[in-house]
């Protein structure tokens, strides 16, 4: 049936597209529902493109570290789209003792998980980035963090997922989710009812409303 799939993903941003791509690579039948008229037109087109491990909850780090090492370096080649990914490191800046305490806590927890991150003083911060003012007294420094272009990366996930058979449907704003025998299976829009064994909500700032 046209409105059924193994997995329905709500949200056509970079997260929804990435989930769709990796599921489709494993042969999963996927539908992506996007409430707007364009794929990647929400938060995925309005961010700095940070690809970072530092500053995260330690529970996220094993997955993020795996992605940095094994997934991001080959994406442009896989997609035949330049994601503009590069690893120039990430500074998380502090101006006072309170900031330093927070950064030290984040750094300590990340090091325990195995991340290459350390605290540096203001002088070393300015050796890395001479344009920063003397107000910056400390920072955490993670040399394997980086950046990518969120627009081209989302496009790459989208184009490649489509080639793998993912069905993308725009203009389908989800208004209700329904359970069948205790399991979330139905996704309702003003125009259609979709059904899947698994439903993933990846709608960014609109996820709470859904």
Q: Model regions: which residues?
A:
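Helical element adjacent to the flavin cofactor pocket in flavoenzyme catalytic cores
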Residues: 140-198, 202-206
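Gly/Ala-rich phosphate-binding loop of Rossmann-like dinucleotide-binding domains
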Residues: 20, 24, 160
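Conserved Rossmann-like nucleotide-cofactor binding loop
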Residues: 15, 38, 206
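Hydrophobic anchor at the start of a short beta-strand
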Residues: 30, 117, 199
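Beta1/beta-strand and adjacent pyrophosphate-binding region of the FAD-binding site
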Residues: 2-15, 31
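Glycine-rich FAD pyrophosphate-binding loop
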Residues: 24-44
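Dinucleotide-binding Rossmann-like beta1-alpha1 core, especially the glycine-rich loop
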Residues: 48-128
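Conserved dinucleotide-binding and phosphotransfer motif residues
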Residues: 26, 113, 164
């Amino acid at each position: 049936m046209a409105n059924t799939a193994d997995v329905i993903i709500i949200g056509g941003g970079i997260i929804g597209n990435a989930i769709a791509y990796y599921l489709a690579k494993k042969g999963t039948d996927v539908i992506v529902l996007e409430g707007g008229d364009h794929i990647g037109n929400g938060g995925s087109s309005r961010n700095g493109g940070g690809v970072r491990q530092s500053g995260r909850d330690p529970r996220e780090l094993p997955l993020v570290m795996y992605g940095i090492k094994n997934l991001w370096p080959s994406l442009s080649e896989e997609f035949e789209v330049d994601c503009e990914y590069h690893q120039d490191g990430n500074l998380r800046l502090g101006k006072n003792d309170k900031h330093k305490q927070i950064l030290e806590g984040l750094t300590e927890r990340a090091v325990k998980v195995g991340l290459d991150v350390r605290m540096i003083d203001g002088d070393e911060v300015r050796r890395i980035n001479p344009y920063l003012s003397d107000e910056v007294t400390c920072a955490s420094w993670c040399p394997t963090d980086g950046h990518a272009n969120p627009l081209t990366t989302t496009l790459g996930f989208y184009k490649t997922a489509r080639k793998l058979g993912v069905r993308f449907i725009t203009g389908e704003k989800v208004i209700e989710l329904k359970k069948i025998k205790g399991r979330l299976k139905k996704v309702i829009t003003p125009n259609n009812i979709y059904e899947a064994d698994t439903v993933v909500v990846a709608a960014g700032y609109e996820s709470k409303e859904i």
